[in-house]
């Protein structure tokens, strides 16, 4: 069974207005893909399953905080998961991407969909980003778990939640990360790929 915009809207209960924004984002992604490699070419036809659903599933893992969550999306690339989270109203999202042409795309989507109140694009390496305290740190198809912890720790408190979609090598990544970091982690099955898991981590500290 194919999975598209209609299936996504049903699964995540999105309004017509939100659905229209997601549709426009998908159109822009396809338009800008040529020459930019925002997502893998082999996933263009399955982007709602592979990218939109994979990103949106994180919303079910967000705890009740009593305020709008502040997210850090490391290596935002084509906007997954950060732009999907912003469109769905999951909080205030800071998208960090070092490649300028990808940032131009991200900013174009923010402007087109009027997301400037909840999504901020930073064209820099995460190490150069001014420090702030994130409630949630996420990253997708960016780096291994240990590297993400290294990059994200300056923005984390002990209460910061890490939501990190990972592929089939997740077990090895967790084992390797434990060599340099202490953390609690749960591996949640992914809705978008039976081989994938979401690392839900907290209490991350260097050893």
Predicted feature descriptions by range:
Residues 1-72, 101-115:
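Class I SAM-dependent transferase core
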Residues 29, 85, 166:
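Residue-level signal for inorganic ion chemistry
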Residues 56-134, 138, 149:
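Conserved SAM/SAH cofactor-binding pocket of Class I
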Residues 91-94, 167-207:
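Active-site capping/gating segments
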Residues 98, 126, 142, 165-169:
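Short strand-turn motif at the edge of the Rossmann-like AdoMet-binding core
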Residues 121, 159-164, 185:
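Short hydrophobic/aromatic-enriched beta-strand-loop microsegments
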Residues 139-146, 153:
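Alpha-helical transmembrane segments of helical membrane proteins, especially in multi-pass transport
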Residues 149-162:
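A short glycine-rich, Lys/Arg-flanked "PGG" loop and its adjoining helix->strand segment in the class I
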